[in-house]
Amino acid sequence: MSKKFKMKRAKNLNGFSIIHDYVTPDQEKKLLKKINESEWVVDYQRRLQYYNYRNELFEPYDLIPIPNKIPKYLDQLINQMILDKIIDQKPDQIIVNEYKPGEGLKPHFDRKDYYQNVIIGLSLGSGTIMEFYKNKPIPEKKKIYIPPRSLYIIKDDARYIWKHGIPPRKYDEINGKKIPRETRISITFRNVIKEKVKHDNIVYPKRSPN
């Protein structure tokens, strides 16, 4: 991760950047091993891991602190991103998502009222197409392929004007070639807006592991 890398900015999508091969295949393998050795919960019908904060699944969907602290191996990854000048503020919330082939993510904004501007994602195990949508002034859709081991940044217009999602399918078509999806692990790094955290809601029920 300390090697030289090139950050590419998406054309006509202000605020989206991507670094291909931010981690090596060996680093990817070690990260996946650490992740799969950690405890999962099942929300949204898929497996996840939450660290430091999460928003509840039930109204009023409070942003709450949780006892699961950011593990050392992810903290080391954060420190490397700071050394590489990708970020200048240490993220304080992480979500790890597992996506099986055929699973997707409906178009959405990351909560504008709970999280700060910069969202960082690291994709492991498989690539995927991420789609961006906006309705005004005219409907538009953009597709960006996220290869495995890539790190991407969503901020500014890409964060606040464009919704993003992942179409649910078992392969993606890139330059006329069908690329099968495999199990993909997505690590998302955010900074919470501290004033929005509900410290009086400290109930964090255990959900189904596995």
Swiss-Prot record:
Residues 90-193 form the Fe2OG dioxygenase domain. One of its GO terms (biological process) is demethylation. SUPFAM superfamilies: Clavaminate synthase-like (SSF51197). InterPro entries: AlkB-like (IPR027450), AlkB-like_sf (IPR037151), ALKBH4 (IPR032857), Oxoglu/Fe-dep_dioxygenase_dom (IPR005123). One of its GO terms (molecular function) is demethylase activity. It holds the Pfam family 2OG-FeII_Oxy_2. Coiled coil: none annotated. It comes from the Viruses. This is Uncharacterized protein L905. It comes from Acanthamoeba polyphaga mimivirus.
